[in-house]
């Protein structure tokens, strides 16, 4: 009998993680899909090992929206590490280079901004013109997609510039990723030798300094927890966040959540993402 019991335990240990995971986060996601009348994609990944802890529609495509700006600045930092770029280099631009929602770059038409300042604006304030100016330095959308392929991401693709890339048409593969691919790419940028240790810390700090993510996971974060994140939004039923989370002010897990094809208001989308985040945190603390 003891031998049989040991065999059963060994067999259970080989089953996919989803079998063991508490259903609570997944139940919250299913509830969110019902309330949103749309689709939710999510993955929770251990930062150190890359192990998937929880997943839902993790291999389905979702619009990246402004979450692509983290990958963009990762590509910029890779060029810095290679000696092809400098964060201190000043970029000058004109009024016609500005697009909708450029709260930082619109104030610096006269003096321009450095590459580092543009990355900070793109991530912390989601400045769209800053993102376009940076995109030009890496070869545009095609150049950023090529960078993704070079680091082993064969799924994520950027096809357009701000602000067209936020169109989020149903069934459109342009400017999309999957939760699993985005999480794996973010992990590569922050833990592998794709970036120097200095560049990894800089990318993480820009995400820590995010100033436009308040209504999402930050709104349910317990005291003393770490968060670094980047959000994305579309007027056509999409919303997203990529984040690093952990208790004791340590980044331990990557969480990626995307919504698409929902008629819900932006406030409702924010609330649902916050609810999923709260469920993950509660499950984590058990």
From Swiss-Prot:
One of its GO terms (biological process) is beta-lactam antibiotic catabolic process. SUPFAM superfamilies: beta-lactamase/transpeptidase-like (SSF56601). The class A beta-lactamase family has a specific amino-acid numbering system, sometimes called Ambler or ABL numbering and often misspelt as Amber. A multiple sequence alignment was used to derive a consensus sequence and then the consensus was numbered taking into account insertions and deletions. This allows use of identical numbers, e.g. for active site residues, despite differences in protein length. UniProt always uses natural numbering of residues, hence there appear to be differences in numbering between this entry and some papers. Residues 1-21 form the signal peptide. Keywords: Antibiotic resistance, Disulfide bond, Hydrolase, Plasmid, Signal. Substrate binds at residues 230-232. This is Beta-lactamase SHV-3. NCBIfam families: bla_class_A, SHV, SHV_LEN_OKP. Disulfide bonds join 73-119. It is an enzyme of class 3 (hydrolase). InterPro entries: Beta-lactam/transpept-like, Beta-lactam_cat, Beta-lactam_class-A, Beta-lactam_class-A_AS.
């Amino acid at each position: 009998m003891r031998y049989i019991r040991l065999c059963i335990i060994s067999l259970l240990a080989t089953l996919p993680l989803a079998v063991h995971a508490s259903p609570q986060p997944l139940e919250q996601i299913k509830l969110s899909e019902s309330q949103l009348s749309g689709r939710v994609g999510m993955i929770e990944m251990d930062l150190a090992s890359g192990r998937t802890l929880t997943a839902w529609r993790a291999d389905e495509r979702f619009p990246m929206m402004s979450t692509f700006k983290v990958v963009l600045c990762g590509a910029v930092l890779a060029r810095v590490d290679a000696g092809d770029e400098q964060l201190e280099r000043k970029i000058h631009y004109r009024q016609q280079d500005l697009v909708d929602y450029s709260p930082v770059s619109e104030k610096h038409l006269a003096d321009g901004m450095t590459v580092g300042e543009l990355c900070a604006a793109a991530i912390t304030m989601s400045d769209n013109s800053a993102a376009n100016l940076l995109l030009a330095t890496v070869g545009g959308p095609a150049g950023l997609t090529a960078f993704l392929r070079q680091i082993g991401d064969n799924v994520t693709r950027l096809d357009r510039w701000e602000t067209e890339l936020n169109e989020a048409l149903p069934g459109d593969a342009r400017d999309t990723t999957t939760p699993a691919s985005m999480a794996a790419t973010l992990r590569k940028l922050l833990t592998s030798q794709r970036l120097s240790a200095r560049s990894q810390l800089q990318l993480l700090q820009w995400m820590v300094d995010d100033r436009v993510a308040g209504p999402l996971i930050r709104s349910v974060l317990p005291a003393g927890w770490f968060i670094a994140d980047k959000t994305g939004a579309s007027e056509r039923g999409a919303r997203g966040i990529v984040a690093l989370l952990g208790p004791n002010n340590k980044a331990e897990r990557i969480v990626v959540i995307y919504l698409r094809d929902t008629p819900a208001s932006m406030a409702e989308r924010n609330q649902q993402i916050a609810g999923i985040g709260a469920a993950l945190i509660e499950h984590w603390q058990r």
